Structures are given as structure tokens and as C-alpha cells.
Curated annotation (Swiss-Prot):
<comment type="similarity">
    <text>Belongs to the bacterial ribosomal protein bL19 family.</text>
</comment>
<dbReference type="InterPro" id="IPR038657">
    <property type="entry name" value="Ribosomal_bL19_sf"/>
</dbReference>
<dbReference type="InterPro" id="IPR018257">
    <property type="entry name" value="Ribosomal_bL19_CS"/>
</dbReference>
<dbReference type="InterPro" id="IPR001857">
    <property type="entry name" value="Ribosomal_bL19"/>
</dbReference>
<dbReference type="GO" id="GO:0022625">
    <property type="term" value="C:cytosolic large ribosomal subunit"/>
</dbReference>
<protein>
    <recommendedName>
        <fullName>Large ribosomal subunit protein bL19</fullName>
    </recommendedName>
</protein>
<keyword id="KW-0687">Ribonucleoprotein</keyword>
<dbReference type="GO" id="GO:0003735">
    <property type="term" value="F:structural constituent of ribosome"/>
</dbReference>
<comment type="function">
    <text>This protein is located at the 30S-50S ribosomal subunit interface and may play a role in the structure and function of the aminoacyl-tRNA binding site.</text>
</comment>
<keyword id="KW-0689">Ribosomal protein</keyword>
<dbReference type="Pfam" id="PF01245">
    <property type="entry name" value="Ribosomal_L19"/>
</dbReference>
<dbReference type="GO" id="GO:0006412">
    <property type="term" value="P:translation"/>
</dbReference>
<dbReference type="InterPro" id="IPR008991">
    <property type="entry name" value="Translation_prot_SH3-like_sf"/>
</dbReference>
Length: 115
């Protein structure tokens, strides 16, 4: 990578990001702007993918809301996310859990592991 670009992006990287992987259940505290007000919205779900590296790294969180699957993709180092909490660690054998989109109910459960 170009040294100039690398030096610029190093200042933008966040250091308060917890360690999480696909299969983990996370609670994301995202800042939402509504008109002139700003509030925190909590989005809790299973991490189904993590992709990219450095400043452009992103993760996708999936949850079921009123029987409908909702997915949201967040950049890891964005200032729009106040904090990320890891609720539980899941045991999976894949890096991308896109197959969860086709599963419903008990079939979509992920076994918990102690870490």
C-alpha cells in the first residue's frame, strides 16, 4: 500500500472494537440522525459476514424482526457506530453464513461456545 495512504488511514482506525467473528451475536449501538436530532439505535443480531481489511473492513448483522429477516451492513471503523457489544459467541464452520437466509425458526439457531 502507498505509504501516504497508509499513514492517513492509520489515524482513522478505531481501537475500541471488540474481537468478534461470524456466528457471534452482537449488539450494535448506531447513531441515527432524524432531522436535527441524533439518537442511538440498538441493532442486535448474528454476524453473518466480515469482509475487507483496514479502514474499509465491513460486517453484516442479521436479525429477525416481526418474522421478517433484516440485515444491516456496518463499516467497522465508522464513527456512526458508538459501540459494539458481543452478546454471545457462536460455533460455526464457515466464514460467510449466507445460508441462514434460507433457514427459519429452530433450524437457524447457532450453538453457543465459551470463549
Amino acid at each position: 500500500m502507498n505509504p501516504l495512504i497508509q499513514s492517513l488511514t492509520e489515524g482513522q482506525l478505531r481501537t475500541d472494537i471488540p474481537s468478534f467473528r461470524p456466528g457471534d451475536t452482537v449488539r450494535v449501538h448506531a447513531k441515527v440522525v432524524e432531522g436535527s436530532r441524533e439518537r442511538i439505535q440498538i441493532f442486535e443480531g448474528v454476524v453473518i459476514s466480515r469482509k475487507g481489511q483496514g479502514i474499509s473492513e465491513m460486517y453484516t448483522v442479521r436479525k429477525i424482526s416481526s418474522g421478517i429477516g433484516v440485515e444491516r451492513t456496518f463499516p467497522i471503523h465508522t464513527p456512526r457506530v458508538e459501540k459494539i457489544e458481543v452478546v454471545r459467541h457462536g460455533k460455526v464452520r464457515r466464514a460467510k453464513l449466507y445460508y441462514l437466509r434460507a433457514l427459519q425458526g429452530k433450524a437457524a439457531r447457532i450453538k453457543e461456545i465459551r470463549r
